[in-house]
């Protein structure tokens, strides 16, 4: 069975921090690096993941990969200097894959994951699928990358529209 192998991965990947009798963590991907974030103030472990989507899915330019890694390492240092507990999952670690990561989190006893809206359909589907399989609750927070909030766009992109035009949205 793989569960014995999984235990070894889990121990090296995450530490347990209990918050309100719930084991919670903040999951941060390479496109979600923010200096000011409400996630940093909740007292949870921050897990920075060099996810396969951003590092392995395609043959990315080496400078792009170096930039992602340097940015993530910089955020790790920044958070540690603020006294926030951080775990860093390298793209070389098996847990950089959504399935393995969520299995590891479940095996370690985590039940609640805070993260930003992934803004990537593939990553969103993977996270939704694996969270259901592993029994993890994901709490999505508004992504600061965007001016509009998701609920603000519901009126415009409702089911009543048959066609979408750039001019109608921006003018």
Residue ranges and their predicted role:
Residues 9-91:
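N-terminal beta-strand-loop-alpha-helix module at the start
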Residues 10, 98-171:
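Beta-rich, aromatic/charged-enriched effector core domains that present basic-aromatic interfaces
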Residues 34, 54, 94, 121, ...:
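Surface-exposed, flexible loop/turn segments at secondary-structure boundaries
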Residues 71-74, 97-101:
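Well-ordered alpha-helical segments embedded in enzymatic catalytic cores
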Residues 91-97:
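Acidic-and-aromatic substrate-binding clefts and catalytic sites of carbohydrate-active enzymes
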């Amino acid at each position: 069975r793989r569960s014995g192998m999984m235990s070894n991965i889990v121990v090296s990947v995450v530490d347990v921090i209990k918050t309100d009798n719930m084991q919670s963590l903040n999951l941060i991907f390479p496109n979600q690096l923010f200096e000011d974030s409400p996630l940093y103030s909740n007292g949870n472990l921050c897990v920075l993941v060099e996810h396969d989507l951003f590092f392995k899915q395609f043959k990315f330019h080496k400078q792009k990969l170096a930039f992602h890694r340097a940015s993530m390492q910089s955020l790790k240092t920044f958070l540690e200097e603020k006294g926030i507990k951080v775990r860093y999952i390298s793209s070389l670690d098996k847990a950089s894959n959504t399935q393995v990561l969520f299995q590891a989190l479940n095996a370690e006893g985590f039940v609640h994951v805070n993260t930003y809206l992934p803004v990537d359909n593939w990553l969103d589907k993977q996270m939704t699928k694996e969270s259901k399989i592993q029994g993890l609750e994901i709490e999505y927070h508004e992504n600061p990358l965007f001016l509009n909030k998701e609920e603000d766009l519901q009126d415009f992109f409702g089911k009543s529209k048959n066609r979408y035009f750039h001019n109608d949205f921006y003018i």
